[in-house]
Amino acid sequence: MRNRFERQLLELNNELIQMGSMIERAIEMGISALVRQDVEKAKKAIAYDEEIDEQEKTVESLCMKLLLQQQPVAKDLRLISAALKMITDMERIGDHAADISEMTILMSDATYERSAINIDLVESMAKETTDMVIKCVDAFVNKDMELARTVIAQDDVVDDLFADFKQQLIKKINENVKNGEQATDMLSGSSIRSRESTRSRKLV
């Protein structure tokens, strides 16, 4: 009985790793569509969110089987509960990525001046966030508390990037009012990215 339970736990870990990879891809697709104003990629990112939703259901179903068909002890119950919370948070991060893509489509009529916006900061925020998601899953699967602590600290890095981004946008708006709408749009996108980082921190 216990051997079967351990095999199912291994399957759960593999499915969590798969979902983490999907979230990483969703974030990359969303930010790429945003900074390049790629409407087609934005549409694909929105459609991809449905696949993430299906993966969440797969993991949730596996957790329910572990709870109902096996006889988990207290530490196993904590593990399964943590997995359920993790997939909920990851699914919401996927939703945020889709939100950014929807915003990209709404902004598609505007022509953006790269000089008006620090794209590098936006991409850095996305890179940090995806790295946090992958580390969170790795920390959970490998029960690595030290790695989990680095993720918590990494959220501060994203917060600092977002603060820098806001300050630069305010400066750009003051210098050139016509870029104000562009700046506001990108601020909305980077704000969503910051919330993704905060939710990534909650995974650990």
Give the residues covered by each predicted segment:
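Cytosolic, long alpha-helical scaffolding segments
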Residues: 1-204
